[in-house]
Amino acid sequence: MTEQRTIASSATREDEAADASIRPKRLADYLGQQPVRDQMEIYIQAAKARGEAMDHVLIFGPPGLGKTTLSHVIANELGVSLRVTSGPVIEKAGDLAALLTNLQPHDVLFIDEIHRLSPVVEEVLYPAMEDFQIDIMIGDGPAARSIKIDLPPFTLIGATTRAGLLTAPLRDRFGIVQRLEFYSPQELTRIVIRSAAILGIDCTPDGAAEIARRARGTPRIANRLLRRVRDFAQVKAAGHIDLAVAQAAMQMLKVDPEGFDELDRRMLRTIVDHFDGGPVGVESLAASLSEERGTLEDVIEPYLIQQGFLIRTARGRMVTPKAYLHLGLKPPRDRAPAIGEPGDLF
């Protein structure tokens, strides 16, 4: 079982509390994701000009990139209320009906982890999204009857880290689909500088850049690292964060210049030492690391693959020469990964 990692992209209670104070309210303050921002600005302005509810939005991408934040920004820009829930919380059709019937015209309903909705709940959601109506069963047995309830026009924003698990009927009902990408170090530096200013942290630009480049392209991780470096600086550097202080704090946290922690390095080294660099199946790798398959696929692998340290081939996972060099090893000539091989999630 994985302990809470400093560079984990999943949200902690501390993250949720801190995010509330630094979360941008407007698109102008939402840094990065420029193509998404440009498109959403047009959709929002068009909906406001027509006086209509904006079309339903599906936002997907790795954890920590700002899906929830973007939903808040959209609601603020539209000038409407936002209701927040998640797929696992909506257990029964009645739970969803209660949420929908309490919405005001043009409100935004945000459902996180929407891929985890049950089939029964999804069936209620379809007519709600298409026709702004829901069918409710009243009574039991032979006396049961269905009544149709009209809903005010609303915008559903669904967020997921696993878009492939969405059913086709649900996915097809979203008129706007946006994918959030990992952030560049430059974009994350701007985010760290902004967060430091809001939180009253004394942080130099080079200190912010050092935090940003180790944040795995993820704002949530960047803000968490900023808080940990702030703790270090308060004890060791009179509260001042510069390049040297940031580097010393990262060394204490065991987060290397690539943004990898012990679990990342252990995964790469396990593939090298136990499986001769790969290929290795995900189940074998998960067993060797004593981790769940989902943890590898959703938490560890995406960034390693995106940075070119790991590839998925038809035969399994393989490390690249870049991974050997990062571990201080010489890449074997006969183990160069076959980049041209087709990818395989399994």
From Swiss-Prot:
KW Transmembrane (keyword) present: no
Superkingdom of origin: Bacteria
Chain sites annotated for binding DNA: 293, 312, 317
GO cellular component: cytoplasm; Holliday junction resolvase complex
Annotated region described as Large ATPase domain (RuvB-L), given as residue ranges: 1-183
Main location, first listed in the record: cytoplasm
Pfam families membership: AAA_lid_4, RuvB_C, RuvB_N
UniProt cross-references to Gene3D superfamilies, sorted A to Z: 1.10.8.60, P-loop containing nucleotide triphosphate hydrolases (3.40.50.300), Winged helix-like DNA-binding domain superfamily/Winged helix DNA-binding domain (1.10.10.10)
Binding site for Mg(2+): 68
Compositional bias of kind Polar residues: 1-11
Gene Ontology BP annotations: DNA recombination; DNA repair
Recorded domain comment: Has 3 domains, the large (RuvB-L) and small ATPase (RuvB-S) domains and the C-terminal head (RuvB-H) domain. The head domain binds DNA, while the ATPase domains jointly bind ATP, ADP or are empty depending on the state of the subunit in the translocation cycle. During a single DNA translocation step the structure of each domain remains the same, but their relative positions change.
Record text on subunit structure and interactions: Homohexamer. Forms an RuvA(8)-RuvB(12)-Holliday junction (HJ) complex. HJ DNA is sandwiched between 2 RuvA tetramers; dsDNA enters through RuvA and exits via RuvB. An RuvB hexamer assembles on each DNA strand where it exits the tetramer. Each RuvB hexamer is contacted by two RuvA subunits (via domain III) on 2 adjacent RuvB subunits; this complex drives branch migration. In the full resolvosome a probable DNA-RuvA(4)-RuvB(12)-RuvC(2) complex forms which resolves the HJ.
Protein family: Belongs to the RuvB family.
Function (record text): The RuvA-RuvB-RuvC complex processes Holliday junction (HJ) DNA during genetic recombination and DNA repair, while the RuvA-RuvB complex plays an important role in the rescue of blocked DNA replication forks via replication fork reversal (RFR). RuvA specifically binds to HJ cruciform DNA, conferring on it an open structure. The RuvB hexamer acts as an ATP-dependent pump, pulling dsDNA into and through the RuvAB complex. RuvB forms 2 homohexamers on either side of HJ DNA bound by 1 or 2 RuvA tetramers; 4 subunits per hexamer contact DNA at a time.
Protein's name in the database: Holliday junction branch migration complex subunit RuvB
Organism, as annotated: Xanthomonas campestris pv. campestris (strain B100)
Lineage, top ranks: Bacteria, Pseudomonadati, Pseudomonadota, Gammaproteobacteria, Lysobacterales
